[in-house]
Amino acid sequence: MMSRTLRNTVARDKLAWKHIEQIRRRWNGPMIVKGVISPRDAVLCREHGADGIILSNHGGRQLDHAVGPLDILPEIAAEKGNMKVIVDGGIRRGTDVLKAMALGADFTLLGRPFLFAAALGGKTAVEHAIKILREEISRDMALLGVNSPSEIDSSFIKRIR
């Protein structure tokens, strides 16, 4: 896309669900929509041809009182149909990954732990952070009594208010 076209397309007052349909018609590859934080929008993404959605409140920077992705995840997972649900935000350690999976996520994204590792120690620190995350997931799965991430479901979650 030409920069002027892109600039004109992303103006807040010009974006509409029809743009998702237009992209879908032109793009045969997987199409994932980021920034979804409501079940209604998840349904609209599915209806307009998205293959997946990324639950994200953009780190709370843009709307600091928006619901957190893990808090709304069960409602969105119930509406996902064939779409993949990816969680971005609030994932810091292995237990967060497993929690997201139990609540219905297909994938999780992690940024901050690796950003901090890179800032503090470069490639070696990032490799170490990845090792820690893998070890946490492996250990916590063992503590839950499961051998595979596919065994994790909502029965492992108890919400206490």
Specify the residue positions occupied by each region the protein language model found.
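Alpha/beta enzyme core
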Residues: M1-V87, T95-F116
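Alpha/beta catalytic cores of nucleotide-metabolism and tRNA/nucleoside-modifying enzymes
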Residues: D71-R161
